[in-house]
């Protein structure tokens, strides 16, 4: 017999766990977007060396499991440096670096979709390259790559449960700790699954609204 009332005393802890999940996803997405944009520009640059290095980076992070990257960063950072990285920092760093590899490909496609005439027009008008990239190219690249960016954010949110492996007190970690205390594993993980589902549906809804708004502006 299911008994969710056993979990009620632990719901305040769940609120904090959900907040950590959202905060983690937000910072990972921001880091992934910034890194992805830089990588996209490098892969499109005229420097063969930089372009090659960027492609190697993308290949490595897309070709190896995210969980392995997470564990490597968490345990190798203190070993290779004098800095003791926290579990949350290791999670944001590994997810951000991984996400950048995927977002870069989406943004690269978005940049290539921008009409070449705009590049030529900007050069003829003498617009500084950095202003042209940030003010003209980036907004259009985001618009072109928006569906892929929304999907990547959703994947980050779902995959955020992996950080519980290194001890981050996120939503899945909450369920794991509560089932150990109450021995109600099914109820605890059902609640965690429901929370993730609601968060993903909310993010998907916001993404759909944003895509509609962008289409209307066209």
Each PLM stretch: what is its role?
Residues 1-218:
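Transmembrane alpha-helices and adjacent helix-loop boundaries
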């Amino acid at each position: 017999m299911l008994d969710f009332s056993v979990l009620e005393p632990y719901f305040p802890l769940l609120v904090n766990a959900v907040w950590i999940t959202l905060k983690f996803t937000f910072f990972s997405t921001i880091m992934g977007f910034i890194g992805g944009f830089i990588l996209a520009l490098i892969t499109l640059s005229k420097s063969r060396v930089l372009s090659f290095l960027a492609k190697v980076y993308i290949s490595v992070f897309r070709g190896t499991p995210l969980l392995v990257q997470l564990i490597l960063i968490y345990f190798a950072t203190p070993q290779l440096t004098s800095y003791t990285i926290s579990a949350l920092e290791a999670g944001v760093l590994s997810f951000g670096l991984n996400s950048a590899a995927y977002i870069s490909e989406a943004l690269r496609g978005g940049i290539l979709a921008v009409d070449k005439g705009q590049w030529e027009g900007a050069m003829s008008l003498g617009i500084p390259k950095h202003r042209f990239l940030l003010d003209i190219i980036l907004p259009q690249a985001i618009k072109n790559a928006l569906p892929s960016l929304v999907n990547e954010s959703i994947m980050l949110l779902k995959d955020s449960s992996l950080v519980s492996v290194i001890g981050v007190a996120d939503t899945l970690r909450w369920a794991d700790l509560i089932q150990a205390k109450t021995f109600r594993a099914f109820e605890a993980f059902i609640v965690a699954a429901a929370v993730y589902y609601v968060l993903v549906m909310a993010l998907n809804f916001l993404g759909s609204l944003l895509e509609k708004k962008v289409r209307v502006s066209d």
